[in-house]
Structure formats: structure tokens, C-alpha cells
Amino acid sequence: MPADVRPMLDRMVHGTVQAVSALATDVPERRRLDGRTVLRWFGLLCLMGAAFFGGYVAWLLWGTGLQTQRAQDALRPAIEGQIADPRPPSEGPKPGSQVVPGSAYAVIEIPRIGLDMVVVQGTDYTSLKAGPGHYVDTADPWDGTGRVGIAGHRTTYLHPFFNLDQVLPGDTIELLTGFGAYTYTVTKNFVLPEVTAGVVLRQTSQPTLVLTTCNPRYASSQRLIVEADLTQPTA
């Protein structure tokens, strides 16, 4: 073999060995890099998911409240004008009369929990965004008989009934309407499964008030119920 060829062959062999060696060691390294990349992306996705979920919860708890507050501000002047100059209860809408969902119905005041909000007509999804809602198939306070039903959100849309569990027997609830003011005294505070809670809205001859909301907080498997008897109607 010519002398000048051997060094060239040696260099070729040495280079090939180095290349094979580098390839052999590079595969696990690439796998390690790929594994770390997957973990980084997974961590990033988890952070993004947590941020999205946190933002959604914040919107439910506080963002929806802004929407309800705007509705309350728009509704209050009209109903307060009616309250300031009430008409006789006999002139109030009769059972079965047409109502406008989402329209101002009354102002509810519960001193125990510091509640003072406009009640709207209706308990559909849209109406309850504006505030507590009157079950339109139940009685009106000015009827002088029957059960008045009002529902309210527990944790969203300004959460009017967030602390309804703290309303106890003996506490008072005031309904201020364009046909007089009505004071109710609480007699019961209890919980029922959601599927059976409708029984509390059955009509009676006794003039009563029933408040309903979801229970426990942040869930809806049950209904928290407050019942109260009419103790002081004021025309």
C-alpha cells in the first residue's frame, strides 16, 4: 500500500468510527430531549387550562354580577316610584294575568343578610340574570291568600341568596310592591332534593312566602328553602 494512502485510510476509518459513536450516543439524547419537550408542553397546557378555568370561575362569581347590577340599576327607579305611591291592593293584577318576564315586580329586603334587591317577574334563565325572580304561577302578595314563590341565584349573577342559609325562624322578610308593603316572618329553613323541591310551591289558603335557591353552594343537587308567614300587610 502506498505510504501516502495509509494516512488517508486511517483518517477515513477514524472519522467513520467517530460518526457511528456520535450517532449511537445521540439517539438517547434526542429521546431525552423529546421527553423534556413533551413535559414542557404538557406543563404549559396545564397552566393555560388553569388560567382559563380560573378566569371562567372569576367571570361566574364577579363578571356575571356586573351584568346583574346594571339590570338592577335600570329596574329600580320605576319600581321605587310605584312603591312611593302605591295603589290599593284590589287594583293589583289578578291571578292568571299576563306578565312580562324580566319586568320589575317588587323589592325584597332581608335585614338578616343585608339583602335589598329588585325582584323580577319570571324564573327563566334570562329573567334570573336580572335578580331574584317571582314564580309567575304562584300568588301575589296583594292577593291576601296563597303562596308567593321567589327564586334566586346562590353563587352567580350577584348571588342574591348566597347567605340564605343564615335566615332563621323569627327573621323578617319585606316585600315592597306598587300595591303595598308586606312583611313576612320566617318559620322554616330546610333543604330538599332538587327533584322534590317543587312541592313547596303548591298553593295553600294561608298567605305565605317561599324562597328557593340551589344547595350546596356551587352545586345544584338540592334546594334550600325558606318559608315565611305573612304578618303585616300594609296598603
Language-model-derived ranges and their functions:
Residues 1-39:
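Terminal targeting segments of Actinobacterial cell-envelope proteins
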Residues 34-235:
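Solvent-exposed, non-transmembrane regions of membrane-associated and secreted proteins
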